Amino acid sequence: MTIDCHEDRRVLLVPHTGRPQNVASAALAAELLDDSGVGVRVLVPAEDTTVATHPVLGQFERVSHSPQATQSVDLVLVLGGDGTFLRAADLAHGADLPVLGINLGHVGFLAEWEKDSLDEAVRRVTKGSFRIEERMTLDVSVYDSNGTAIGRGWALNEVSIENSNRSGVLDATLEIDSRPVSSFGCDGIIVSTPTGSTAYAFSAGGPVLWPELDAILVVPNNAHALFTKPLVVSPRSSVAVESHPSAFPATAVMDGFRSISVPPGARVEVKRGSRSIKWVRLDDIPFTDRLVTKLRLPVEGWRGPKNMIPQINPHSA
């Protein structure tokens, strides 16, 4: 995969500017791209003056979070944590652009490499030395009690159906492939992709799914019932959550920042997304190694198969 070789190649740089060291990393990335003849456009919140006044970043085009931000862009480069990546993915998904994450945060499960390898990552981008991995998404539709569509959205990680005020119990019925599974009270129901299985669904007791697996994960969150185990269903399945007519108003929250109101008696339908995310990969390190590294899992004493050559990734923390 390469960035299209036209004269006005351009990368949308999406930095988390909350820390001085992050701004310095963004400036470095912008300079490296510019020196390689790649145009730079910087995404910044409207209230953020850090970029505009920065001696390096202030020289580049600045845009806000809108569909226009990705016009004439070839790739989205994210510098930050998982939250920054998910917001950048919102733009990349709408424009069908590849997205690359460099972790400047703590865990950074969605990032490809760590900040210490930023210069090499940018070099790979400018040379086209990367491949694209298609990551599954979810399409979300909300219908009122009369069956009228009242909202649609999508998620890369998960959609969480939960009480709007988070102070009561969500009374709901879970449905798989147009058949009822169970009715119960809970804090919420999480429907996740394999990519999102290490996020909110994992914290709620769900299993980790390897990202190359095609499946949909359903995790009841703090449910008050006997049968509330996580479910792994076919990627072709439809998952629905019906709110009880006398229930409190609820909300379908997608990736933690996009939301749709779910009134009493409403229905939330979740299916495999019609468009995947184009995930930039810079190496072939197994997901198992990423999992161990990110979660700092203890593996002392492991010897491994005979004659196995260990894989070492110098670009991951």
UniProtKB/Swiss-Prot annotation:
<comment type="function">
    <text>Involved in the regulation of the intracellular balance of NAD and NADP, and is a key enzyme in the biosynthesis of NADP. Catalyzes specifically the phosphorylation on 2'-hydroxyl of the adenosine moiety of NAD to yield NADP.</text>
</comment>
<keyword id="KW-0521">NADP</keyword>
<feature type="binding site">
    <location>
        <position position="87"/>
    </location>
    <ligand>
        <name>NAD(+)</name>
    </ligand>
</feature>
<dbReference type="InterPro" id="IPR017438">
    <property type="entry name" value="ATP-NAD_kinase_N"/>
</dbReference>
<feature type="binding site">
    <location>
        <begin position="157"/>
        <end position="158"/>
    </location>
    <ligand>
        <name>NAD(+)</name>
    </ligand>
</feature>
<dbReference type="GO" id="GO:0019674">
    <property type="term" value="P:NAD metabolic process"/>
</dbReference>
<dbReference type="Pfam" id="PF01513">
    <property type="entry name" value="NAD_kinase"/>
</dbReference>
<keyword id="KW-0963">Cytoplasm</keyword>
<feature type="binding site">
    <location>
        <begin position="82"/>
        <end position="83"/>
    </location>
    <ligand>
        <name>NAD(+)</name>
    </ligand>
</feature>
<feature type="binding site">
    <location>
        <position position="187"/>
    </location>
    <ligand>
        <name>NAD(+)</name>
    </ligand>
</feature>
<dbReference type="GO" id="GO:0005524">
    <property type="term" value="F:ATP binding"/>
</dbReference>
<dbReference type="InterPro" id="IPR017437">
    <property type="entry name" value="ATP-NAD_kinase_PpnK-typ_C"/>
</dbReference>
<dbReference type="InterPro" id="IPR016064">
    <property type="entry name" value="NAD/diacylglycerol_kinase_sf"/>
</dbReference>
<protein>
    <recommendedName>
        <fullName>NAD kinase</fullName>
        <ecNumber>2.7.1.23</ecNumber>
    </recommendedName>
</protein>
<dbReference type="GO" id="GO:0005737">
    <property type="term" value="C:cytoplasm"/>
</dbReference>
<keyword id="KW-0547">Nucleotide-binding</keyword>
<dbReference type="InterPro" id="IPR002504">
    <property type="entry name" value="NADK"/>
</dbReference>
<dbReference type="GO" id="GO:0006741">
    <property type="term" value="P:NADP biosynthetic process"/>
</dbReference>
<keyword id="KW-0067">ATP-binding</keyword>
<feature type="binding site">
    <location>
        <begin position="198"/>
        <end position="203"/>
    </location>
    <ligand>
        <name>NAD(+)</name>
    </ligand>
</feature>
<dbReference type="GO" id="GO:0051287">
    <property type="term" value="F:NAD binding"/>
</dbReference>
<feature type="active site" description="Proton acceptor">
    <location>
        <position position="82"/>
    </location>
</feature>
<dbReference type="GO" id="GO:0046872">
    <property type="term" value="F:metal ion binding"/>
</dbReference>
<dbReference type="GO" id="GO:0003951">
    <property type="term" value="F:NAD+ kinase activity"/>
</dbReference>
<dbReference type="Pfam" id="PF20143">
    <property type="entry name" value="NAD_kinase_C"/>
</dbReference>
<comment type="similarity">
    <text>Belongs to the NAD kinase family.</text>
</comment>
<keyword id="KW-0808">Transferase</keyword>
<keyword id="KW-0418">Kinase</keyword>
<keyword id="KW-0520">NAD</keyword>
